[in-house]
Curated annotation (Swiss-Prot):
Protein name: S-adenosylmethionine synthase
GO cellular component: cytoplasm
Pathway the protein acts in: Amino-acid biosynthesis; S-adenosyl-L-methionine biosynthesis; S-adenosyl-L-methionine from L-methionine: step 1/1
Localisation: Cytoplasm
Keyword ATP-binding: yes
Signal peptide: none
Main location (coarse class): cytoplasm
Residues that hold K(+) according to the record: 44
Disulfide bridge positions per record: none
Species lineage: Bacteria, Bacillati, Cyanobacteriota, Cyanophyceae, Synechococcales
Annotated positions binding ATP: 16, 175-177, 251-252, 260, 266-267, 283, 287
Major enzyme class: transferase
Length: 417
């Protein structure tokens, strides 16, 4: 019997209050790592009407004007006017930063393996910056090997920003959210059930001021200039049965930090797989790569994507866990949900053989401390909105599939042995 079900994921635009915070946090991280690649950073940001608070823990030799960084990022997002209750030049920016705890630093600077003289390997030098669990996922539903609901939600959110920035829909404002519901049959996406877009906008569009007429115009414009371009290169398409909802409250004029307070790290499902995969709970933005919440989650995605790209599974989830101050993972798990072409235990052995999963190894393999400097001071802030994974618009080291051929060949050899 065919099993039919619906699955939904959401995304948000760069002007969403929580995403403003994520982007400021990662802009700070980019600047500090550009000047001092060994910086230890945990930058948290809060925004509200007229206020930006930058807090957390930072240990660095870099000398950077964080207030200017925050204002420039806010202006880049699009909050430049004074009529929104939140603007780059009229908000108050407060800074309350401490240094990284020496109790934490000693475990990161020298991992337990070297403190106890149990290993002199180079990658055993740095301990994990915290305990925790991290997940990575890949599947063959979308070209970028991501689940289709989050892939489409991100595409819609990015296109919302495109038509705002280029002036096609100049009445749009920065805040917005998207949501896509996909119908599945026996685990395969078969239809677009619902598309939801909530976008901040001016109260009037030209000479149109009636609320209902404004919403009708927005809905028509979004279908033509946001939805249709997003689906132009996809096999799956919205049809006559697809519900299209736009600003269901009836209007969305008050938005951004004037409408809701924002906080770094509050959109972790948007940042990852849209709820399609499990999540360890750790946020990414504002954290330097010694924090395994970030670097190990990138490594998990890298492993899972290479397994799927190799054709060894249709779906793959990888879990890592760490102990603070210890270099080697406490556990590694590979799960293919019955779609694997070889046993999960075989894949696990291949992962242990071909992927470096100690923090120092992950940092070196992905060049995570130096990429901001090599890319003109802009690296982490580029993934702080519209997802950290499946970003074909960016050159991200954890999205490479350079190990797929090796995995495929060695997995095939095990089946022939």
């Amino acid at each position: 019997m065919t099993r039919r079900y619906l699955f939904t994921s959401e995304s948000v635009t760069e002007g969403h209050p929580d995403k403003i915070c994520d982007q400021i946090s990662d802009t700070i991280l980019d600047a500090l790592l550009t000047e001092d690649p060994s910086s230890r950073v945990a930058a948290e940001v809060v925004v509200n009407t007229g206020l930006v608070l930058i807090t957390g823990e930072v240990s660095t030799q870099a000398q950077t004007n964080l207030i200017d960084l925050a204002r420039r990022k806010i202006a880049e997002i699009g909050y430049t006017g004074e009529d929104s209750g939140f603007g780059a030049n009229n908000c108050t920016v407060l800074i309350a930063l401490d240094k990284q705890s020496p109790d934490i630093a000693q475990g990161v600077d020298t991992a337990q393996e070297q403190r106890q003289a149990s290993s002199d390997e180079r990658f055993d030098s740095i301990g994990a910056g915290d305990q925790g669990i991290m997940f990575g996922y890949a599947c063959n539903e979308a070209p970028e090997l991501m689940p289709l609901p989050i892939s489409l939600s991100h595409r819609l959110a990015r296109q919302l920003a495109v038509v705002r920035h280029n002036g096609q829909l100049d009445y749009l404002r920065p805040d917005g959210k998207t949501q896509v519901t996909i119908a599945y049959e026996d685990g395969k996406p078969v239809a677009i059930d619902t598309i939801l877009i909530s976008t901040q906008h001016k109260a009037a569009i030209g000479d149109i001021s009636d609320d209902n007429a404004v919403q009708e115009r927005i809905k028509s414009d979004l279908w033509e200039q946001v939805v249709l371009p997003v689906f132009s290169d996809l096999v799956i398409q919205p049809d006559s049965a697809t519900r299209f909802l736009v600003n269901p409250t009836g209007k969305f004029v008050i938005g951004g930090p004037q409408g809701d307070a924002g906080l770094t790290g509050r959109k972790i499902i948007v940042d990852t797989y849209g709820g399609y995969s499990r999540h360890g709970g750790g946020a990414f933005s504002g954290k330097d790569p010694t924090k395994v919440d970030r670097s190990a989650a990138y490594a998990c995605r890298y492993v899972a994507k290479n397994i799927v790209a190799a054709g060894l599974a249709e779906k793959c989830e990888v879990q890592l866990s760490y102990a603070i101050g210890v270099a080697r993972p406490v556990s590694v798990l590979v799960e293919t949900f019955g779609t694997g072409k070889v046993a999960d235990e075989v894949l696990l052995d291949l992962v242990r053989k071909h992927f470096e999963l100690r923090p120092a190894g992950i940092i070196e393999h992905f060049n995570l401390q130096r990429l901001p400097g090599e890319r003109g001071g802009r690296f982490y802030q580029e993934v702080a909105a519209y997802g950290h994974f499946g970003r074909n618009d960016l050159d991200l080291p954890w999205e490479q599939t350079d190990k797929a051929d090796t995995l495929r060949q060695e997995a095939l050899a095990t089946t022939q042995a």
